[in-house]
């Protein structure tokens, strides 16, 4: 605990790092300068073994002087293809690319964690493994690549976190069990028979059939799924036609499915295709259907989550620690959880008084930078608690 509470002196450094990453964002699988910046910082820190497990990721290992468990800590580094509309002096210098999800803060936090734990290395037992991950935002994701490169070999526990705009700055949120959804994608192509819009009876109207499909898909959640199961089926694209007087031969529908159980993903895939099949057959059309499985759901381990929660309670008290409901957003942190138990918690970063009110992936998204030292405190103190408990 003593180590973490000294952090206030380096808050300015955390902010400086975060603003640097915010000014120079890079998209998924393009994090060349970001990863090099991180690598160069870590390489200057004594006692670290620093490597590049994949082209755009960085790993650092801090080996304790006594045996113990191996704890991994992860931060993601990629930005989004969004044109920033903020007006502060460190906005993105790259048009159409922006840190609109807080990953700039995640990198800064983990760099702070590295520095604080290196200062406390005499107390470290086992190994702390720091994972700076590329490409969280873009499936198939960087986590799978890092796992394939062996970064989770020998890891006993893994911890990750997200700066969270809907949670007030100063608060820490935890979720026991299923925490974040599996984000799957489906695509439907309806093949009808095109023709004159004024003579519709001679056509097989792909638009009319497509609207029936979209309407019927809403029944999956409302009538075919247990209300106690969390499921989202959202149509997000519908493309058909090029002019006002032609009924198009083809309509394309795309959307996403979000769920917290793998079994429910499989059931939903089958139900979507059943609906498409029956509707198109009824109107004499044909179809093609594809379903792409995204990241697995993030399911937090009870014991690891409890240590994070108890640590946050020790630091801040009950009024600043909350148990959140699962979110239907997706996260490839789940790839790491396939290899070791762990937890993914949330660091409050919103502040209505400062106008920090915009949601993730919004062109005016930002974070309250007061959240940065809080994130470092929770990570560092939790790791020290793991070590002291012999977990």
PLM feature spans:
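Metal-dependent amide/peptide-bond hydrolase catalytic core
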Residues: 208-391
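Non-cysteine beta-strand/loop elements that form the S-adenosyl-L-methionine
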Residues: 72-74, 83, 186, 344-349
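Divalent metal-coordination and catalytic microenvironments
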Residues: 21, 60, 73, 103, ...
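Active-site beta-loop-alpha junctions enriched in small/polar residues
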Residues: 26, 76-78, 135-137, 164, ...
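Acidic/His- and Gly-rich active-site-bordering loop/insert found
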Residues: 1-99, 104, 108, 115-124
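Structural motif
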Residues: 69-72, 128-129, 156-159, 211, ...
